[in-house]
């Protein structure tokens, strides 16, 4: 009888487990798949910074308003907020210490939308430290035998089609930023190896290949010129240098009265008159 009773309990337990599993699966299946979008944030020590998050969905579903999001800094939850009708929510965070922090945003488990956690970088910088602007194209290895541009980092660092970093670029850039420079990363959204890449995809590619943490500037309709103007208007006037690959990048930085190093060397006659060139990344530090 004891064996029969034990068997009966196990059967009941299995049935209950199956019911719970089906209910959970049904609940998850009823959610609309979505995406969380968060940009890097830049501020001063002991200053408040606004972190803006967007909830996006590809198909029609539940209203985007009222979705609860959780904000974490370096893995510690610091705030929760609800989205408005546009699916946006803003968090104000007081950054105390100089350095870089990991911003993480998670969607609440009870939300009608399912989305993976997303990360960004919070840069807490002092204004006196110089900033180097780096064109992401200069970090991506080009295939000289191919007539087509290299694929963008959209596929992720573990995919065979993902861009390969230039040898020694991460190491040399880390040396530049260890004690002296802060780094702002920019890229061309419309063409080149980083075309159609989002800031999150660029950020993940940089992290996967051990490039130093920095501010990944979001592409705007005004291009690089608008990005530089926005940083200056926010008080970041110590942008003195840049490292890039293309003539367009070099021309724009020279217009902003910045020194610029192009790596590798451009074909003869294409280098702007006041720009410097380096054969490889080992030469870059000597040129700045």
Region locations from a protein language model:
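Edge beta-strands of extracellular beta-sandwich domains
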Residues: 112-123
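Short amphipathic beta-strand segments in non-cytosolic proteins
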Residues: 68-79
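Conserved, compact domain cores that house catalytic/ligand-binding motifs in diverse enzymes
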Residues: 126-219
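Beta-strand-rich domain onsets/edges
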Residues: 29-50, 122-126
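Short, aromatic- and glycine-rich surface loops/edge beta-strands on solvent-exposed regions
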Residues: 98-111
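Beta-strand-rich structural segments
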Residues: 44-63, 69, 140
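Glycine-centered loop-to-beta-strand initiation motif
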Residues: 77, 81-95
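C-terminal cap/substrate-recognition subdomain and adjoining C-terminal extension
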Residues: 193-288
